[in-house]
């Protein structure tokens, strides 16, 4: 048989021409082992730190450990269907979550997926959960108040928009209650709230959502829930997801408030992930970068200036500053604030509110210890009227606690000490407040004015709260215009002081 070279070359040519360029380049690897939500993968030579990985069954993971011949990843969500030998693909993307006002009123998981049974959320945008915090030039000093509606906080440890104020205390001291009251008080203030529940019982989160709904707060609140039944990876990621949702409002010249409840559980979840990835443990078995875990999160809460907002929105929003205020919560063990995570977060934040078990059990609620609670930047942001009226209260309380300790041993006390003790007892009583009952600025001003001018001095201690409640009702019915004026101007003029004094004296006669 004679072979014709030209025929062969024609055949080869036609084959080459018919070859389609449908080949795609993909970076993929193979699962070596999977356990406890941690997966070791062989291959993935081009993977990036923090990159999203795609597993079979529409499951995603996060590449955290990049080693010479393998990659350590955490799986976000269920991992029971993943087995040895499965193919894992790189996505080329960092983990992203949906953002925007469409999330308000909804409960979502750490990946921004709805878990409240109210159907899908049609958000238009997504954003990476990890972002670099605004730089020094982009920031503006904190000088606008973030009213919590809690007398003890707004008078003694005021919080400003863009501040990070730590709420710290043992279990069952009312930490969450303080944060939820602060969210409820933002109604009508133009502040969007994000509540991040980390490692809590699903029933507790349900109760919080119900309370927010009852007080009409859910319409401006996003709840990000990583319950105790979810994987450590989801608990660790949830705080960053919530922060990314809050930054949407900050960067567009609006104000947002985010509560992390709580960062102790987030640190424990991160410790679990790190130990399973065989990272070397340090103090209290936490990994070496646990400080960075919290600092990079809390630094993203800031007040940004108008130039930053204008540049971010490409000129769509002009002349408006944005803010993200953070209220991280830390749970201490038997009041030990010198443990690793509490000291870290204290040093990162702009002040802290200490809640004490002994005060809580003795009926002082919110159980705020005025002596060691501070707000490092909030003083500049405090409302003028509250600032003017609350000056003496903090010192009165601190001296009262000190004297009360001595008075237990002294049999005969001089008149001035007795007077100070009596006043301190009444101030302590006045600062008690029921849960879910935040006060407006004007009513708070009325209470502080009354205690400063000595209208409570001749009352029995147990009558103080009843007198205050009655006084508030009287002011609302008979002096609504004065309350509205204080609410609008945030000031108490000399003429108004006289009217207010007369009104309180008037009410006291009938009490």
From Swiss-Prot:
EC number: 7.1.2.2
GO cellular component: plasma membrane; proton-transporting ATP synthase complex
Topology in the lipid bilayer: Peripheral membrane protein
One of the record's GO molecular function terms: ADP binding
Subcellular location: Cell inner membrane
Domain of life: Bacteria
InterPro entries in UniProt: ATP_synth_asu-like_sf (IPR023366), ATP_synth_asu_C (IPR000793), ATP_synth_asu_C_sf (IPR038376), ATP_synth_F1_a_nt-bd_dom (IPR033732), ATP_synth_F1_asu (IPR005294), ATPase_a/bsu_AS (IPR020003), ATPase_F1/V1/A1_a/bsu_N (IPR004100), ATPase_F1/V1/A1_a/bsu_N_sf (IPR036121)
Cleaved signal peptide residues: none
Catalysed reactions listed for this entry: ATP + H2O + 4 H(+)(in) = ADP + phosphate + 5 H(+)(out)
Principal subcellular localization: membrane
PROSITE patterns, sorted: ATPASE_ALPHA_BETA
Site (Required for activity): 373
Keywords tagged on the record: ATP synthesis, ATP-binding, Cell inner membrane, Cell membrane, CF(1), Hydrogen ion transport, Ion transport, Membrane, Nucleotide-binding, Translocase, Transport
Residues holding ATP: 169-176
Protein's job: Produces ATP from ADP in the presence of a proton gradient across the membrane. The alpha chain is a regulatory subunit.
Quaternary structure note: F-type ATPases have 2 components, CF(1) - the catalytic core - and CF(0) - the membrane proton channel. CF(1) has five subunits: alpha(3), beta(3), gamma(1), delta(1), epsilon(1). CF(0) has three main subunits: a(1), b(2) and c(9-12). The alpha and beta chains form an alternating ring which encloses part of the gamma chain. CF(1) is attached to CF(0) by a central stalk formed by the gamma and epsilon chains, while a peripheral stalk is formed by the delta and b chains.
UniProt family annotation: Belongs to the ATPase alpha/beta chains family.
NCBIfam families recorded: atpA (TIGR00962), PRK13343.1 (NF009884)
Protein's name in the database: ATP synthase subunit alpha
Organism of derivation: Janthinobacterium sp. (strain Marseille)
């Amino acid at each position: 048989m004679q072979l014709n070279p030209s025929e062969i070359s024609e055949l080869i040519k036609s084959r080459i021409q018919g070859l389609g360029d449908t080949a795609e380049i993909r970076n993929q690897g193979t699962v070596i082992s999977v356990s406890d939500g941690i997966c070791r993968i062989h291959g993935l030579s081009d993977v990036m730190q923090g990159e999203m990985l795609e597993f079979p069954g529409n499951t995603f993971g996060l590449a955290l450990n990049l080693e010479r011949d393998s990659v350590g990843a955490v799986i976000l969500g269920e991992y029971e269907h993943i087995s040895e030998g499965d193919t894992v693909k790189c996505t080329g993307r960092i983990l992203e979550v949906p953002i925007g006002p469409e999330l308000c009123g909804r409960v979502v998981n750490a990946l921004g997926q709805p878990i409240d049974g109210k159907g899908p959320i049609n958000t238009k945008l997504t954003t990476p959960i990890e972002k670099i915090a605004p730089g020094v030039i982009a920031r503006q000093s904190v000088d606008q108040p973030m009213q919590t509606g809690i007398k003890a906080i707004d008078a003694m440890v005021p919080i400003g928009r863009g501040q990070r104020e730590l709420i710290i205390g043992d279990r069952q001291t009312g930490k969450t209650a303080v944060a939820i009251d602060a969210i409820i008080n933002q109604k009508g203030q133009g502040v969007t709230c994000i509540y991040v529940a980390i490692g809590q019982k699903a029933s507790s989160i349900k109760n919080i959502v119900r309370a927010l709904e009852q007080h009409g707060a859910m319409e401006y609140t996003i709840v990000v829930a990583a319950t105790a039944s979810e994987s450590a990876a989801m608990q660790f990621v949830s705080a960053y997801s919530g922060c990314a949702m809050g930054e949407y409002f900050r960067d567009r010249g609006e104000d947002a408030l985010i509560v992390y409840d709580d960062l102790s559980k987030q640190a424990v979840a991160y410790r679990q992930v790190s130990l399973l990835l065989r990272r070397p443990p340090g103090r209290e078995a936490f990994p070496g970068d646990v400080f960075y875990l919290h600092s990079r999160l809390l630094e993203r809460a800031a007040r940004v200036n108008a130039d930053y907002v204008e540049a971010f929105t490409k000129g769509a929003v002009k002349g408006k500053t944005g803010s993200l205020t953070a209220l991280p919560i830390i749970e201490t063990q038997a009041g030990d604030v010198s443990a690793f995570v509490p000291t870290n977060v204290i040093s990162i934040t702009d002040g802290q509110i200490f809640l004490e078990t002994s005060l809580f059990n003795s009926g002082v609620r919110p159980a705020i210890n005025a002596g060691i609670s501070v707000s490092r930047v909030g003083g500049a942001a405090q409302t003028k009227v509250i600032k003017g009226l609350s000056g003496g209260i903090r010192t009165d309380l601190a001296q009262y606690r000190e004297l009360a300790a001595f008075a237990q041993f002294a049999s005969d006390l001089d008149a001035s000490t007795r007077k100070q003790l009596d006043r301190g007892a009444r101030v302590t009583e006045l600062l008690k407040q029921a849960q879910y009952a935040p006060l407006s600025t004007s009513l708070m001003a009325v209470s502080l004015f009354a205690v400063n001018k000595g209208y409570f001095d001749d009352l029995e201690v147990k009558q103080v709260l009843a007198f205050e409640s009655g006084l508030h009702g009287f002011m609302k019915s008979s002096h609504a215009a004065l309350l509205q004026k204080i609410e609008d101007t945030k000031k108490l003029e000399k003429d108004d002081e006289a009217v207010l004094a007369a009104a309180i004296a008037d009410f006291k006669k009938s009490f």
